[in-house]
From Swiss-Prot:
UniProt keyword annotation of Cytoplasm present: no
UniProt-listed InterPro entries: Aldolase/citrate-lyase_domain (IPR005000), HpcH-HpaI_aldolase (IPR050251), Pyrv/PenolPyrv_kinase-like_dom (IPR015813), Pyrv_kinase-like_dom_sf (IPR040442)
Organism: Actinobacillus pleuropneumoniae
Cellular component aspect of the GO annotation: cytoplasm
Cofactor(s) needed: a divalent metal cation
Molecular function terms from GO: aldehyde-lyase activity; metal ion binding
Gene3D superfamilies assigned to the protein according to its UniProt record, in alphabetical order: Phosphoenolpyruvate-binding domains (3.20.20.60)
Annotated protein name in UniProt: Hydroxypyruvate/pyruvate aldolase
Enzyme Commission number(s) of this protein: 4.1.2.-
Length: 263
């Protein structure tokens, strides 16, 4: 049976490398139907949040299958980093993984070892029988996957900021994702990502990471803040979430009808 699509080609990675801004949306629920609805929009990538959402490997795989016919690229943020986590996700065909709360160069190096095949890493070999290689039908899977995958390390604490250089300079890091909400909390400011002190930390981090030639992603509270960070070098954003959209639309609808009917 012929393979009619290059399943390994990583749209998100190549578009970032080509200088095309990439817009992402978070999936906090485990619904494959909601994921497919989001895949019909103009968002470029789906932020499958297995850190704060109740995802497991099966729900992640169901979501990835649901959006596979579309141009949207799946990105999984794991709850915690471990060798087994990387094997399961990557063998299931997930090529873009965000690891939260990375705080040192040593942590960064260990994560990359879990994600890469020897000699660059220690990822176990099971490619011949798993979805990632389309069950052995992509003969050059092992040769290509390390170049096509993108492992993103999330810096979101004061300690992570202190060790930014060591993290960003780690060989094999695909991108750095900055988490201003946790950073703000760590600074004693609550989740206020618009606070001037948080913005100053973010500005420094973005410019410094770009000096290492590493792509930077983050979230933004407003279009104006996103534009400011993009001007500094951010090339991909996570903007909004399925649960927030649903709550906002529900509130707006019932409020408008109540306002008219209860005059």
């Amino acid at each position: 049976m012929a393979i009619v699509k290059d399943f390994l080609y990583n749209n998100l990675k190549h578009n970032i490398e080509a200088g095309k801004m990439q817009y992402g949306v978070a999936l906090e629920t485990t619904s494959a139907e909601v994921a497919e609805v989001l895949a019909t929009t103009d968002y470029d990538w789906l932020f499958i949040d297995a850190e704060h959402g109740p995802h497991n490997i099966q729900t992640i795989l169901n979501v990835a299958r649901a959006i596979a016919p579309y141009e949207m690229t799946p990105v999984v943020r794991v709850g915690e980093a471990a060798a087994g986590t990387f094997k399961q996700l990557m063998d299931s065909g997930i090529q873009n993984i965000i690891v939260p709360m990375v705080e040192s160069g040593e942590e960064a190096a260990q994560i990359i070892r879990w994600a890469k095949y020897p000699a660059e890493g220690k990822r176990g070999m099971g490619a011949g029988v798993v979805r990632a290689s389309r069950f052995g039908r992509i003969p050059d899977y092992q040769q290509r996957i390390d170049d096509e995958s993108m492992i993103m390390l999330q810096i979101e604490s004061l300690k992570g900021m202190e060790n930014l250089d060591a993290i960003a300079s780690t060989k094999g890091v695909g991108a750095i994702f900055l988490g201003p909400a946790d950073l703000a909390v760590d600074m004693g400011l609550g989740p206020n990502i618009l606070h001037p002190d948080v913005v100053a930390k973010m500005e420094y981090a973005i410019k410094r990471i770009r000096e290492f030639g590493v792509p930077v992603g983050t979230i933004a509270a407003t279009p104006e803040q996103a534009k400011h960070y993009a001007d500094l070098g951010v090339s991909f954003f996570a903007l909004g979430a399925d649960t927030a959209f649903l709550a906002s639309a529900a509130d707006s609808t019932v409020t408008s009808f109540k306002a008219e009917l209860e005059k």
